[in-house]
Amino acid sequence: MAAKSDGAAASAGPDPEGAAGGARGSAGGRGEAAAAAGPPGVVGAGGPGPRYELRDCCWVLCALLVFFSDGATDLWLAASYYLQNQHTYFSLTLLFVLLPSLVVQLLSFRWFVYDYSEPAGSPGPAVSTKDSVAGGAAISTKDSAGAFRTKEGSPEPGPQPAPSSASAYRRRCCRLCIWLLQTLVHLLQLGQVWRYLRALYLGLQSRWRGERLRRHFYWQMLFESADVSMLRLLETFLRSAPQLVLQLSLLVHRGGAPDLLPALSTSASLVSLAWTLASYQKVLRDSRDDKRPLSYKGAVAQVLWHLFSIAARGLAFALFASVYKLYFGICIVGHWSVMTFWVIQGETDFCMSKGEEIIYNMVVGIIYIFCWFNVKEGRSRRRMTLYHCIVLLENAALTGFWYSSRNFSTDFYSLIMVCVVASSFALGIFFMCVYYCLLHPNGPMLGPQAPGCIFRKASEPCGPPADAITSPPRSLPRTTGAERDGASAGERAGTPTPPVFQVRPGLPPTPVARTLRTEGPVIRIDLPRKKYPAWDAHFIDRRLRKTILALEYSSPATPRLQYRSVGTSQELLEYETTV
């Protein structure tokens, strides 16, 4: 039985041979457990599972502190401009606070409506599941609120008490209260705060509950953390980044000693940008069992890397904008257009539809105005080097144009600003090298990334065996009658002739003692798994998420996810082409 979820079918069946779900360790130090990845496309959910730790709780509390400090300083600064009768600065500051917040709250409330709404007559995504234990009962469900049935469609054995009118009334009252609370929270622009607190609550519940409920709460915590990290990433680059450039340009234009309140607002915006980027990368790696999780030391190194890089970038923008306002806008639009086109050319695969993918690429283009953001799997060394060279040239050009128009009575002040831009960019590159050389989850990334034919340490040849056919023949020449007669004579004479078709040799089968798996069903998703650094489909597709949570909560054992493997289809296609 198949289930559609935005074009994807999800089903759960017997555990395939070799499809073992690897367990991950604790939230803070799960690198060793995640290293032993299973077959491609299998998302492990069995075993002891991860464990929520105290430092995870502290990380969420620090994220809340950064969120409140950024918003409070911006509103305080806007009120200060209003009291000083600086209505232009007041309007711009308030616009950069309210407009991104409204966009993010609408998106967050839209997600809430979909997650908590019950379908009315429309068939939801159907999922069928069969236990991996021999003879286990098959279960199927429609959407997260559907009832589970046996394979024949009859209700599961056992008493099925009908809900009383009192319980149904209490349930409706609870749902009404939740809707009213969420509406009030989002009207107060506190949707992200609610999601942070809910992620904290779910993480603590996963630590205190039993094994089965612990895994369920941990999955919910990962889903909530993914949502709030994506919302924060969108909001910070729509709010904090323009706010940073605006306040820095005002400070440079005024000159002299900076005021306390604009300096606090600028610092809070800068920390918010750096923290959001590091938090996004950490949650993304924690959500994928095929990648090693990011340690907190690596996350702090990323915060420092982005902090100094964005500071240099923002200060260069502010210096140039304080003198050439019109040309600054042209430079920003031009850089965004080039970066967006570059991202689109890379053919990213983050969203479930083409329209959402284009919007995502446009947002990534905004991020590329200020800092590096990896959107494509593979060795990103060349792309990262090219990007930082472009940023270095732009920073030098923007600062140079500002320095050429300086006032000669403030040469020392101008020289200090140039040195701050250069040293901040250098510190950002330094912490980036520290992260990639010492704290990257996969080990040092700036040395030789993998042994191969070029390096002497390779224990095996890189090429395929001599007797293996790696590509199909381009054409088969037509044989003539003389060749056929010669071939027949050769066969009669006993001379060996080469075979027409050759089968590529495979690995010899090794006898493995197979045991029945008892850890639960496997939820099969009829989609190829998205490559890192993209989110998995069950984090993006909310219907698929609801179905997985329903199966995970109702199953006596923790199910595992298996995406469609593209290896088998590629092998079949290559075989058909060869024949």
From Swiss-Prot:
Residues 1-40, 146-165, 466-510 are annotated as: Disordered. Residues 19-31 have a biased composition (Gly residues). It holds the Pfam family XK-related. GO terms for cellular component: plasma membrane. Keywords: Cell membrane, Membrane, Transmembrane, Transmembrane helix. It is a multi-pass membrane protein. It comes from the Eukaryota. The chain crosses the membrane at residues 59-79, 89-109, 260-280, 314-334, 355-375, 384-404, 415-435. InterPro entries: XK-rel, XK-related_scramblase. The keyword Transmembrane applies. Residues 1-18 have a biased composition (Low complexity). Belongs to the XK family. This is XK-related protein 7. The gene is XKR7.
